[in-house]
Amino acid sequence: MVFVKTLNRTLYLEVAANEDVLSIKQKIEAAEGIPSAEQRLVFAGRQLEDSDCGLDAEATIYVNLELLGGAKKRKKKVYTTPKKNKRKPKKVKLAVLKYYKVDENGKITRLRKECQQPSCGGGVFMAQHANRHYCGRCHDTLVVDTATAAATSGEKGGKKGKK
């Protein structure tokens, strides 16, 4: 016995072990009225040829119909301008060194402030602007008083601070 799934229902056909696919197609034609030339039988993911034989007991065969036509073949597009290259950021060797400063004595000091938020954790440095420190990860901003910052650090302001 073989199960045959057609477009709208399932058929149960008695098939001998050595029977070929062509005779199964003729049985389907008698039961459903689908011409055997238009039938495409699929078993285990591959299409069966008319000369194939030796299907397993209680195998499920799917019936598909041959379709006419298809989509029109299209021309390959020809572009007039070349493709724009993506911008690759330059790799800076030892980029971590901009976060630390080493004295003559070998003492290491941090140049940037670490973010205090628990979501960031240790090792996340804040960006240093003229009047604030900004964390790019959690978007936390610490505003620095410009009068006290210039007096303590000895730094001048950004571009706007120059005269």
UniProtKB/Swiss-Prot annotation:
There is a cross-link at residue 70 (Glycyl lysine isopeptide (Gly-Lys) (interchain with K-? in acceptor proteins)). The keyword Metal-binding applies. Keywords: Isopeptide bond, Metal-binding, Ribonucleoprotein, Ribosomal protein, Zinc, Zinc-finger. Residues 1-70 form the Ubiquitin-like domain. One of its GO terms (biological process) is translation. Coiled coil: none annotated. It comes from the Eukaryota. GO terms for cellular component: cytoplasm; nucleus; ribonucleoprotein complex; ribosome. CDD domains: Ubl_AtUPL5_like. It comes from Caenorhabditis briggsae. A zinc finger (C4-type) spans 115-138. This is Ubiquitin-like protein 1-ribosomal protein eS31 fusion protein. It holds the Pfam family ubiquitin. SUPFAM superfamilies: Ubiquitin-like (SSF54236), Zn-binding ribosomal proteins (SSF57829). Signal peptide: none annotated. PANTHER family: UBIQUITIN (PTHR10666). GO terms for molecular function: protein tag activity; structural constituent of ribosome; ubiquitin protein ligase binding; zinc ion binding. In the N-terminal section; belongs to the ubiquitin family. In the C-terminal section; belongs to the eukaryotic ribosomal protein eS31 family.
